[in-house]
Amino acid sequence: MIHSTWNTPADFWKDRRVCVTGGAGFLGSFVLAALQQRGAAHVFVPKIEDYDLVNPQDIQRMYHDARPDVVIHLAALAGGIGANRARPADFFYINLMMGVQLMHEAWKRGVEKFVAIGTVCAYPKFTPIPFREEELWNGYPEETNAPYGLAKKMLL
């Protein structure tokens, strides 16, 4: 549904400042292209070299620099089964703290919209296929991806 003050969906994005964490990643490249196609003219992509999104001071500085109306949070510590097994605490802590602190700072600053992206790794180990959203909370994720999956699930 288009809000009564918008003539087209592009009107929504035209004057909004958008911050896309993880915008330099695989999914981020598609999100940036979609935003451009929809008329978003003010898009800020924080670079990992400039902002540690687990550090509260860096998060505050990022929000100060970007001044976003909308945040699309795609950034993550991601890896395969081996990486999750080798560093489970890092996968859980970094992904959870990054998301929670970004979300909390957005709330404190009155950001209009915050979008946190989930993952199929958040679904229970024995979820029927095709996956349905109603199944998300019906069990524990598959153990090899649980640290990442649980952290992302907690942001939904």
Each predicted region: which residue ranges?
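Non-catalytic terminal and boundary segments that flank Rossmann-like NAD(P)-dependent oxidoreductase
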Residues: 1-18, 64
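Adenosine-cofactor binding site in Rossmann-like domains, unifying the SAM/SAH pocket
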Residues: 41-61
